Amino acid sequence: MTNVVVSGEQLQEAFREVAAIVDSTVAITAGPRGKTVGINKPYGAPEITKDGYKVMKGIKPEKPLNAAIASIFAQSCSQCNDKVGDGTTTCSILTSNMIMEASKSIAAGNDRVGIKNGIQKAKDVILKEIASMSRTISLEKIDEVAQVAIISANGDKDIGNSIADSVKKVGKEGVITVEESKGSKELEVELTTGMQFDRGYLSPYFITNNEKMIVELDNPYLLITEKKLNIIQPLLPVLEAIVKSGKPLVIIAEDIEGEALSTLVINKLRGGLKVAAVKAPGFGDRRKEMLEDIATLTGAKYVIKDELGIKMEDLTLDDLGTAKNVKITKDNTTVVSENSDSDSVKARIEQIKSQIETSTSDYDKEKLRERLAKLSGGVAVLKVGGATEVEVKERRDRVEDALHATRAAIEEGIVPGGGVALLYASSVLDKLKGASDEEQIGINIIKKVLSAPIRRLVKNAGLESAVIIDYLIKQNDKELIYNVEAMNYANAFTAGVIDPAKVVRIAFETAVSVASVLITTESMIVDVPSKENASSPMGAGEMSGMGGF
């Protein structure tokens, strides 16, 4: 491989090409009347999806320069997906339109730094306006919760109602997970007991699902300790017993490092041991209490610590905890238990309640209530089924999107949906003036781009957007939307066409961040096949003039 430097108008043209591909491929999935996209796989049948994030990841242009730019777009979707798990299609629409508009201005000779400064200035004003438009959502208003989920699930009422019902059952601190069902029933909810804490896997090598970048272990044993583990020798007897049992192992410890961590990773990669390790949640005395909670929930005999005088070498499988399944992301661990009705769990709950009553510290009471909610709130498992694997995967994508959107709505409230929140927010830019002509161009770009999501939603429904947008603006009612599913104008909250404010905010913030980076990029260094590689689709003649880009 060799590389070349691409800059100037050739780079700007590549930016516009990729932005146009994204706008025409990812954007067609937007809204209830959006279309599905087929993504070819190296093996098996193509995946049919309406998930904008998956479509964006599937775009791999043949030209090396375009492929590099597409990967940056995909990274923006990934950031949005990681933060809220939804809004990736909106983020793609905003990013691609910002790039196309800014690239035209740069090609006309305008200063790119000034344009970026104007975009950043407009961003700050728009974020404040989105926050002011937000309306708090209550768990008691189950219809509002359901509507958020229904919209994110592309109008599927069964998904929306199931998620709303799950939220109501487990509460704000409860956990909701999604898994594929072996049956043909489209969607069912199973309520069980478990908890989630904010610690992720200690090494990405523990990952079992590379597509979602998570660890999923069924029926694992749990070894819970307050100790730091840095040598493997004391663990060998229990690890050998685990291997013989054929079950996975999850280790929760103060820390795992050095030889202990590397040995676990090597054995996992070789297939000899299904294992994952996470750090214990919390700090100090609170960490000790949370480990005791986990031990009680999983039926472990004890948390292994120096005070007990128990040696690691003497552990047996009977001393360990068990769970129905454990899911670990880079940030969180979810334990679904089969030990929920045990006397020890009930006694632990009563003990925490008693501590809440006797505590004189508001801070301590708050933390105790969090522990109580985690221990007693439960876990709702949404089981997704279908007639074929393709159907199951497509439905699971929509369920997960809807679940993420619902969580975001509970956190930061809701705003009118259907793309109007950004459209109406753009009106505050009328009074914003840039310090230079280029800054004003940047502000004007944001003002124009903020109408892109609603334009795309209406276009996907086969309608003319200009007439609808003009009518909405003239009515001067920030709760008025155009419902592309019912094909009529309506109040957003009455019609249930609403979006989580957090999803709208993150999608816009991320789009501005990525667009700002690309706008100020003057050159890109791109790897291309060497001239000697005759089999390359890009011959030597193309390389010398860089026509293969």
UniProtKB/Swiss-Prot annotation:
MF terms (GO), sorted A to Z: ATP binding; ATP-dependent protein folding chaperone; isomerase activity; unfolded protein binding
EC number: 5.6.1.7
Gene3D superfamilies attached to this UniProt entry: GroEL, GroEL-like equatorial domain, TCP-1-like chaperonin intermediate domain
GO CC annotations, alphabetized: cytoplasm
Entry keyword Cytoplasm: yes
GO biological process: protein refolding
CDD domains in the record: GroEL
Pfam families: Cpn60_TCP1
First and last residue of the signal peptide: none
Root EC class: isomerase
Keyword match Nucleotide-binding: yes
Assigned keywords, A-Z: ATP-binding, Chaperone, Cytoplasm, Isomerase, Nucleotide-binding
Recorded catalytic activity of this chain's protein: ATP + H2O + a folded polypeptide = ADP + phosphate + an unfolded polypeptide
Location in the cell: Cytoplasm
Annotated positions binding ATP: T29, A30, G31, P32, K50, D86, G87, T88, T89, T90, G418, D499
Quaternary state and interactors: Forms a cylinder of 14 subunits composed of two heptameric rings stacked back-to-back. Interacts with the co-chaperonin GroES.
Protein role: Together with its co-chaperonin GroES, plays an essential role in assisting protein folding. The GroEL-GroES system forms a nano-cage that allows encapsulation of the non-native substrate proteins and provides a physical environment optimized to promote and accelerate protein folding.
Family membership noted in the UniProt record: Belongs to the chaperonin (HSP60) family.
Protein's UniProt name: Chaperonin GroEL
